[in-house]
């Protein structure tokens, strides 16, 4: 049985990346929350 996580840089950035987050209002809310919390990394 293969492992479920098969990392791909393109898929990671397209699904969870900064530009993807910025493209929707909810994504911008996510970034705002993470900035407020003081996260070092905002997105993938």
Curated annotation (Swiss-Prot):
Residues 1-44 are annotated as: Disordered. Gene3D superfamilies: 1.10.287.3980. Belongs to the bacterial ribosomal protein bL34 family. GO terms for molecular function: structural constituent of ribosome. NCBIfam families: rpmH_bact (TIGR01030). InterPro entries: Ribosomal_bL34, Ribosomal_bL34_CS. Residues 1-22, 31-44 have a biased composition (Basic residues). It holds the Pfam family Ribosomal_L34. Disulfide bonds: none annotated. One of its GO terms (biological process) is translation. This is Large ribosomal subunit protein bL34. Keywords: Ribonucleoprotein, Ribosomal protein. It comes from Levilactobacillus brevis (strain ATCC 367 / BCRC 12310 / CIP 105137 / JCM 1170 / LMG 11437 / NCIMB 947 / NCTC 947). It comes from the Bacteria. One of its GO terms (cellular component) is ribonucleoprotein complex. The gene is rpmH.
